[in-house]
């Protein structure tokens, strides 16, 4: 009798689980030849970046119109860099895109090689007006800001400042958008340095750098709290920390005092990227599980979807309709991390996922 009751209970549990449907993934765009790691969507156009170090060919920044036509953006000239060429008005290696109103902000690491040094005038933040398709301002990071080993990674904005993570030579870069002045903060602080006890695992395997050691990626994801008080950030493998923006932007605050004001935020797992909505929901990819999750303002973490197609979602984009755009560059499968042999499964896609339930 006990076995019958247990069996009935198990069947009921399974039946209950079967009614929980995952949201559907919709393919927005896909590529059979270039890896895309970041996406933005504006007025019917989709913008995609393809970092040079992955070894695939194509523009650093591509625009796809409503008819599916693809073109280098904002021009072919901006996508024409070659070794030895002046890098001031060309993209060397784009790592991130950020849409703010009608402006597209482009983060150029300036380093054509993973783990390499930025070339002269290569590391920069470029602002493009999407109404005119013109570059309206470029913020250059000289050798005192994008230092040897720097990999300027991602960007967020608040109160006239830009905040960028340095995933190579660990730190945070603060830029005054009016004057263009930039400075480094929290250099090599424990909150920006990848921890040795947190490996990056995908497909149940530790991702290894070209030297055979476990890959470590320093300060990478970041977000600004919806009230503009905090900057949230962390190494790619987590966890995340927070610091008040008023402290970050105070040049008179001694480095040791700023470091003392850093607080723990959340134990976010290894993530390729994140995006926060107007309610403070933090959407992030969970690399180890091919999943998208969301951290609610109260700290609860919910799962949106688990799907093997979402392999290394890198930089989610949330559009005005509440749809997540999810690029899946499969970074762990590129030749650089696999002894020179690419394991990328083509085509590489950007998926759409509704956050509305």
Show where each model-derived region lies.
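Beta-rich, blade/repeat-based domains predominating
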Residues: 32-43, 85-101, 107, 144-161, ...
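Beta-propeller fold detector
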Residues: 70-79, 136-140, 183-198, 250-265, ...
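Loop/turn-rich, solvent-exposed surfaces of beta-rich toroidal or solenoidal domains
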Residues: 225-245, 259-301, 307, 313-314
